[in-house]
């Protein structure tokens, strides 16, 4: 039991059941009852109920009185939840899903960059610049490119000083773990430092229109790389 779920039994059970739901394990059979889960994994009733409660809050499950617990359709899932998004990318990863995510980024990050150009503080400028420096270091083998790229994009979201845009940070970070690995692989293991620098420069200069355009160009480049990665699947 401890080995199966790690040190936190509730989160371990949540992750196991969440992945099973996302991969479609219960598409053709009922979701197990509370008693069945307890028996199968040797865990307490309180741990089981808490894990199911967490999955219900994420939109994956629905409990009906005297009928049991059911898996909800995918359109009901909270795709903005980092756990749900991670399970989707881990268990059901597809280029189409990544493409949809980057299309969402086109509607969020350019506007966040424009707001950052108007509102960012000197400290937030420094955070964006630090992310860019880490990317340069990563190209020289002195830092992790994935962490650097995520740090840059999260810093821009925070610099928007808009609470709603900032809420996208965990979702963006989670999905970029997959997206950046794919696009950097297609690009030969490098990120486009120049396009990231253009975003940074526009924000520091206070040019909202240029910041918006530069971020849009950066994300569009990622979409182009995804299309290149998709070419072998079409042949």
Locate predicted features.
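All-alpha effector-binding/dimerization core of bacterial HTH-type transcriptional repressors
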Residues: 78-155, 194-217
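Amphipathic alpha-helical interaction elements
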Residues: 53, 117, 137, 157-161, ...
């Amino acid at each position: 039991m401890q080995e199966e779920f790690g040190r936190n039994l509730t989160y371990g059970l949540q992750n196991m059941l969440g992945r099973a739901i996302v991969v479609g394990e219960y598409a053709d059979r009922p979701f197990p009852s509370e008693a069945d889960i307890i028996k199968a994994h040797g865990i307490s009733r309180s741990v089981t109920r808490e894990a199911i409660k967490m999955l219900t809050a994420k939109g994956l499950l629905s409990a009906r009185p005297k009928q049991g617990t059911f898996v909800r359709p995918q359109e009901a899932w909270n795709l903005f939840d980092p756990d749900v998004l991670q399970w989707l990318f881990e268990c059901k990863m597809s280029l189409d899903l990544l493409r949809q995510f980057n299309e969402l980024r086109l509607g969020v990050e350019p506007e966040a960059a424009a707001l950052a150009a108007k509102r960012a503080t000197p400290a937030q400028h420094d955070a964006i610049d630090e992310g860019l420096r880490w990317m340069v270091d990563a190209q020289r083998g002195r830092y992790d490119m994935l962490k650097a790229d995520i740090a840059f994009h999260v810093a821009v979201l925070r610099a928007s000083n808009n609470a709603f845009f900032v809420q996208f940070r965990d979702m963006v970070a989670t999905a970029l773990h997959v997206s950046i690995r794919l696009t950097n692989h297609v690009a030969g293991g490098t990120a486009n430092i120049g396009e990231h620098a253009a975003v940074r420069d526009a924000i520091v200069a206070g040019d909202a229109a240029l910041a918006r355009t530069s971020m849009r160009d950066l994300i569009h480049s990622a979409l182009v790389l995804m299309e290149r990665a998709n070419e072998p699947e079409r042949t």
